[in-house]
């Protein structure tokens, strides 16, 4: 697994980039672990993904990140199909860390240049975009509630919580809970409280 590092305000976020299908399966395992708290075998991950082939968007997303061979073309087609079904626009080129959770799996638009860290929760009806500048960089252990919009060139630091309906126009400090239009810091109490079953990485 290749690791790319991106700067936040006071730390770095380390993003795994799969270099083979074994790496893709590790990423899928991390996503499953976030839901169940149990680390599954590679065979269990594959069988579960195929069993739910018409709905398992993260299974096809992770496999689409390794861009080689005939299998890649099949995975891209399946990912496009499932994405359209659930109205989720997350380009396969988007760099996302271990342990992604999609709440309710519906209606999300994320710019392909966005960087998303490890153990992040994305909820329904969120928009992370840009028109001209660099897209957002999101750190580790971040919870983004429903109906949140994050504008270009902001950094969401580690352990942040973004309340429902917020519009984020500036950097969010580490451990902060923010909400509102525009989003403002409410407190620094109990950071990352909604991030359950965290996948531990060597880089963390």
Features from the language model and the residues they span:
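Terminal amphipathic alpha-helical/low-complexity segments used for targeting or macromolecular assembly
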Residues: 1-86, 195-204
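Accessory, usually C-terminal, subdomains that scaffold auxiliary metal cofactors
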Residues: 163, 184-185, 193-200
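Left-handed beta-helix
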Residues: 86, 91-92, 97-98, 103-112, ...
